[in-house]
Amino acid sequence: MQLGVIADDFTGATDIASFLVRNGMPTVQLNGVPTRDLPLTSEAVVISLKTRSCPAEMAVSQSLAALRWLQAQGCQQFYFKYCSTFDSTAQGNIGPVLDALLAELGETRTVISPALPVNGRTVYQGYLFVGEQLLNESGMRHHPVTPMEDAHLGRLIERQGRGKAALIAWPIVARGPEAVAAALAAVNDPAVRYVVLDALSEQDLLTQGVALREMKLVSGGSGLAIGLARDWAQRHGARGESAQAGMPLAGPAVVLSGSCSVMTNSQVAAYRQQAPARAVDLSACFTDLESYVRTLTDWVDAQRDAPLAPMIYATTEPQTLQRIQAQYGDKASSERVEQMFAALAAALKAKGFTRFIVAG
């Protein structure tokens, strides 16, 4: 098995798994760290954790458990996947997790490559952009859990980790894989653990994929997976085979949206104009969760024959979110919404729903 991916949340794991498959690498996605070996025949395994916003100690422990399981399956290269908006404050866990993974693997250096140009995430001179805006000037500055106040990836990772950061800027990336590999080899300061990579286009990600094929540990958003998978598929003549390894299930579908990001708010606003949609009543979640889940289940089930999948959404704008958090508390409101969605998904599965679209 070639690649083992440790993803810090479920939606991100799904993103990177789909990019790997689309670019030619047969992939299996797992929810959580398995407790036993599995008879896998894929070339990549993605383990979905729930560590994006948890304390560093917990994130490190779970990430190391995932790494050790992937090592036991014979993976040759490892990929720590976080969000393309680098959701993490100075107290965040990206740096501590990278430090722990490097130590476990006996490595001294990795890369930071969150760029995903197809979604408007680019890196230039080490600064992360969302569309035309710097990260800290975008909607991410209002993120309810990880408000982003700086767009400079080197500074962000140095505040969290135990090492220094270096940069391979776009003019070098534009010269191709050999130039990137040479620049990596030329980083001779032993204090540098993290090398930030610029990327403005998919071609830059393809360049990175070739240049990093021998690096034991890489890190980034989903974008770098495009380059790694495409390079692997071209070298093994496997492009196109991965898409035939499994097909989506048929059957009733439902959309469950819990993210309160600016992008998800826009997507929910557009979708609810076209499909049956119902907002989550947080007070009902606290008053009688079991009864409220039954109410939502019955509503979704009644819409199963609609042309577009019905949607249940807790997505809301920052002002409303602040009022909710003030009333119920940040942690309590977040956990109760998660409990509601978990119970709702289980109830809908029992009703015969087979496709769950998790927005955000």
Question: What function would you assign to each model-found segment?
Answer:
Residues 300-359:
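C-terminal structural cap/anchor segments
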Residues 1-43, 61-63, 113-118:
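N-terminal basic/disordered segments at the start of proteins
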Residues 131-298:
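Conserved, well-structured core segments that form the ligand-binding/active-site neighborhood
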Residues 32-34, 55-69, 340:
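Glycine-rich, highly charged phosphate/nucleotide-binding loops
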Residues 67, 101-109, 292-308:
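Short amphipathic alpha-helices and their capping/turn segments at secondary-structure boundaries
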Residues 9-12, 83-92, 117-119, 200-203, ...:
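Gly/Ser/Thr-rich loops at beta-strand to alpha-helix junctions
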Residues 5-7, 28-30, 78-82, 110-114, ...:
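General beta-strand structural signal in soluble alpha/beta enzymes
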Residues 1-2, 43, 59, 67-78, ...:
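Cap/lid and interdomain-hinge subdomains that line or gate substrate/regulatory clefts
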